[in-house]
Regions:
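Conserved pre-motif I regulatory segment
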Residues: 28-74
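Interdomain "pre-motor" coupling segment immediately N-terminal to P-loop NTPase/helicase cores
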Residues: 1-33
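Conserved Walker A/P-loop ATP-binding site and its immediately adjacent core
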Residues: 82-87, 91-92, 99-122, 203
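Residues at the beta-strand->loop junction immediately N-terminal to the Walker
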Residues: 74-75, 106
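Conserved SAM-binding loop
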Residues: 2, 54, 105, 147
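Inter-Walker segment of RecA-like/P-loop motor cores
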Residues: 121-159
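ATP-binding Walker
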Residues: 79
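SF2 helicase catalytic motif II
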Residues: 151-203
Length: 203
């Protein structure tokens, strides 16, 4: 069962008087949440060399997302979506990446691959050291810890290729073709942290 369907399953069963038994795994339950130490988070923000601090709504968005291992964040144009993504990614790398896994960021266009890379550099990241970009026939094998790719470039990759990722961030997730995105997510079985970003939600 896809995690996103869990809430609908609970509603379906509740309306029909069915009980639901769950067995928690290392990934937790889709609707479970954990407490984020805001003192630790504030110290983290001070130490990562940001050119500016997050606005209140950006701060709240990151904290809310971190309380869950998967979520869709509604982030309209001008809200600083790439900055929210950056903070989530860097917090994961600093505190949650216990298995030394990589981060995969999926975008719909090559221009967004370059834009995110440029944004992350502006936020203080050493992009030459840490980021590998995949599109238009670029090499899909790298030792770098963060991969930014178009979904078109990777959705046909074998399952083994996705096992190195512990976090997946999807930009403009409402525009992904459902079968392609499902293929990626189903193959990335080791990715405990999954977040989608969109400026609009359909339905």
């Amino acid at each position: 069962l896809n995690a996103g369907l869990f809430v609908y399953l609970l509603k379906f069963c509740s309306e029909r008087g069915y009980s639901v038994d769950t067995e928690e795994t290392d990934y937790g339950l889709p609707i479970s949440s954990k407490k984020i130490d805001t003192y630790e988070f504030n110290n983290f923000l001070e130490k990562i060399g940001l050119p500016f601090m997050p606005r209140e709504y950006q701060y709240d968005a990151v904290i809310t997302a971190l309380q869950r291992s998967n979520a869709i964040l509604l982030s309209p144009t001008g809200s600083g979506k790439s900055f929210i993504m950056y903070l989530l990614m860097q917090y994961y790398r600093a505190f949650l990446n216990t298995k030394n896994q990589k981060v995969l960021i999926i975008v719909p266009t090559t221009s967004l691959v370059e834009q995110l890379t440029s944004d992350f550099k502006e936020y203080g990241m050493d992009v030459e050291k840490d980021i590998h970009k995949i599109y238009s026939g670029k090499d899909k094998i790298t030792k770098k810890n963060v991969i930014i790719s178009t979904w078109q470039s990777i959705y046909k990759n074998p399952r083994a290729w996705f096992q190195k990722f512990g976090m997946i961030l999807g930009d403009e997730c409402h525009g992904f073709k459902s079968k392609s995105l499902s293929s990626i997510m189903n193959k990335a079985t080791e990715a405990k942290y999954r977040y989608g970003f969109t400026g609009t939600l359909d339905g």
